Design a protein with these regions (language model features):
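Glycine-/small-residue-rich active-site loops that bind phosphorylated ligands and cofactors
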Residues: 18, 40, 92, 115-116, ...
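Solvent-exposed, non-membrane alpha-helical residues enriched in polar/charged side chains
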Residues: 27, 31, 49-53, 72-76, ...
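Active-site phosphate-binding strand-loop segment of PLP-dependent enzymes
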Residues: 115-179
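Extended hydrophobic secondary-structure segments
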Residues: 87-97, 107-125
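N-terminal "arm"/small-domain region of PLP-dependent enzymes with the aminotransferase-like
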Residues: 1-38, 43
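The start of beta-strands in P-loop NTPase/AAA+ ATPase cores
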Residues: 9, 78, 84, 106, ...
């Protein structure tokens, strides 16, 4: 009788690798925040916002608890809520759809472009040109940049703009990715 070979485990990710590589800096920043007593809106948060904005080439950045809150705040800032629909890609984290539902809007899932797994601009154009019956107006489009793979933003912006919809890029999984 042959013994079964032990299973081969292929590691998919090492979430701790980034921390280990930056351990001293991260631990020092956490210690400074804890020592200051300012866990929210303190110097460390302000420094992070300034550094992140500079890294992105933006004038400002606002730190929030998570990507869901960020998307919900942007949607609210655009006045999007009940009576509106928001298109996003079908291949995304639940957080993207949760943000749309948090503001009372209706999520509309757009199929992927098979090569990139990001929003298919042609599918978006088809839905915007011929929305399903009874769907509220699509007031915003949220393409999601996944795994460092940017969506076809220029084409999505043109398509959404032609239909009066704002574009909100969900970059929570692709900070620093380039088109």
């Amino acid at each position: 009788m042959n013994a079964a070979a032990p299973p081969v485990i292929v590691p998919q990710a090492d979430p701790g690798a980034s921390y280990r590589a930056q351990k001293a800096a991260i631990d020092a920043a956490v210690a400074r925040a804890l020592d200051s007593g300012w866990y929210i809106l303190g110097k460390e948060g302000a420094a992070f916002e300034a550094e992140f904005a500079a890294w992105q080439g933006a004038r400002r950045a606002v730190g929030v608890a998570n990507g869901t809150d960020a998307l919900a705040l942007i949607l609210r800032g655009l006045g999007i809520g009940p009576g509106a629909a928001v298109a996003t890609v079908s291949h995304t984290a639940v957080a993207t759809v949760a943000a749309i539902e948090m503001v009372g809007a209706v999520p509309v899932l757009i199929d992927i472009e098979p090569r990139t797994y990001t929003m298919d601009p042609a599918e978006l154009a088809a839905v915007l040109a011929n929305p399903p019956p009874g769907l509220p107006p699509i007031r915003a489009v949220i393409p999601v940049h996944l795994y460092g793979q940017p969506a076809a933003v220029a084409e999505i912006i043109r398509t959404a703009g032609a239909h009066g919809a704002a574009v909100i890029e969900d970059c929570s999984q692709s900070h620093g990715a380039l088109i």
